Swiss-Prot record:
InterPro entries: SERTA_dom, SERTAD4
Region of interest called Disordered, as start-end residue ranges on this chain: 36-66, 221-259, 306-325
Biased composition (Low complexity): 221-257
Gene name of the encoded protein: Sertad4
Domain of life: Eukaryota
Compositional bias ranges of the Basic and acidic residues kind: 306-317
Tissue: Highly expressed in adult epidermal tissues and in digits.
Domain SERTA stretches: 101-147
Protein name, UniProt field: SERTA domain-containing protein 4
Organism: Mus musculus (Mouse)
Entry GO CC: nucleus
Pfam families (UniProt xref): SERTA
Length: 377
């Protein structure tokens, strides 16, 4: 006796397990059992879910999964679920075991401490490192100071050298450094006067080569100019002036090695001669004779008793009294006076108040100058 069991339970789709997958497996099993022949009855039309499942199964063997037709159902389900688990690994496997930054720094410090323990004398090592650090700081500071000290192009034509160096701000240098070529570009003589504290730039230097000849010419000119002044002067104080004036001029010219301007004689100027600096002559011997016009010259003479006598002469009288060889001297004197009166090359303009103060200082009898000593009494 045999027991026949119905197969309806296996063929009916179960909704809880997924009807699409079971229907797909049933069609594949039926096709395999019939050996490629068409199954009896009308072929069921696969739904949209069946198409997706069949396409998924058809392309599964390209990923290393064997064809599900030749494999049992249990093996296929196991591999399918195992493949899904491989695609999503656990998060615990993603975190690598690495040392944190703080632990790494602590390890480095510990190793450096172990190295320091093997040094013979730690104090010597520390002292050496401090010295090296200080030396590097000094070298860096020296480089910064050298870069900050920039000497511009030497254009000292308008300003004197002393004022130019005082105007420069050099906090890193005790002494300013100037190249030799820049010192050679300075051609003007700077003289600081006591009157007003102004700086006078002389474009023409004093001739030192012909000191003896110019002194003799000055003495002769002074003697010739003093002889007619006695007859023309009306005041009694000027009648006693001709006798001591040649002696005072000769003594002053003989005492000073250079023909410098003083109360009773003039100066010869030459362009190609050597300059005279402040240390060679006293500042009180250089004075400016202000001229109200180019044709009139004023000469101030001082007697032994301290009285002042003024003499005024025209250009014709001066040229007639002086020798013929002193024409260049007179032209140079005119350039000298014109330089102080109008300014050389329109750069050094003197204010009118300073001119008036100079005139008052020269004409007032209170400021007495000594020709022999070259100073104020």
């Amino acid at each position: 006796m045999t027991l026949v069991l119905s197969m309806n339970r296996f063929c009916e789709p179960i909704v809880s397990e997924g009807a699409a997958e079971i229907a797909g497996y049933q069609t594949l099993w039926e096709a395999d059992s019939y050996g490629g022949a068409s199954p009896p009855g009308p072929a069921p039309v696969p739904s949209q879910g069946d198409r997706g499942a069949s396409s998924h199964l058809a392309g599964s063997h390209y990923r290393g999964i064997p064809n599900p037709i030749s494999t049992p159902k249990v093996t296929y389900f196991k591999r399918k679920y195992a493949e899904d688990e491989d695609l999503h690994p656990p998060l615990s496997s993603c975190s690598h075991k690495t040392i944190s930054i703080f632990e790494e720094r602590a390890h480095i410090l510990y190793m450096s401490l172990e190295k320091l323990r093997f040094i013979d004398d730690p104090e010597v090592y520390l002292r050496r490192s401090v010295l090296i650090n200080n030396l590097m700081k000094r070298i860096h500071g020296e480089i910064v100071m050298q870069n900050s000290w920039c000497l511009p192009a030497c254009s000292l034509g308008g300003t004197p050298a002393q004022e130019w160096f005082l105007a420069q701000d050099c906090p890193y240098r005790k002494r300013p450094r100037v190249a030799k070529e820049e010192w050679e570009k300075i051609h003007t003589c700077c003289f600081y006067q006591e009157c007003g504290g102004h700086c006078l730039n002389l474009p023409l230097s004093v001739n030192t080569s012909v000191g003896s000849t110019s002194a003799a010419a000055v003495a002769s000119a002074a003697s010739s100019s003093s002889s007619p002044s006695t007859s023309s002067s009306s005041s009694p104080s000027s009648s006693s002036s001709p006798s001591p004036s040649p002696s005072s001029s000769s003594s002053s010219s003989s005492s000073s090695p250079l023909p410098l301007p003083s109360c009773s004689h003039h100066v010869d100027f030459d362009i190609g001669s050597a300059p005279i600096y402040k240390s060679q002559i006293p500042a009180s011997e250089i004075f400016v004779t202000n001229i109200r016009s180019l044709g009139v010259q004023e000469k101030v003479k001082f007697n032994n008793d301290g009285k002042v006598s003024h003499e005024t002469s025209r250009d014709g009288d001066a040229l007639g009294q002086e020798p013929v060889g002193n024409d260049l001297d007179f032209e140079c004197k005119g350039q000298f006076y014109d330089y102080f009166e109008t300014g050389y090359n329109e750069r050094n303009r003197v204010s009118e108040s300073w001119k008036k103060s100079l005139r008052k200082k020269e004409l007032s009898p209170s400021s007495k100058l000594c020709c022999n000593r070259g100073g104020k009494m």
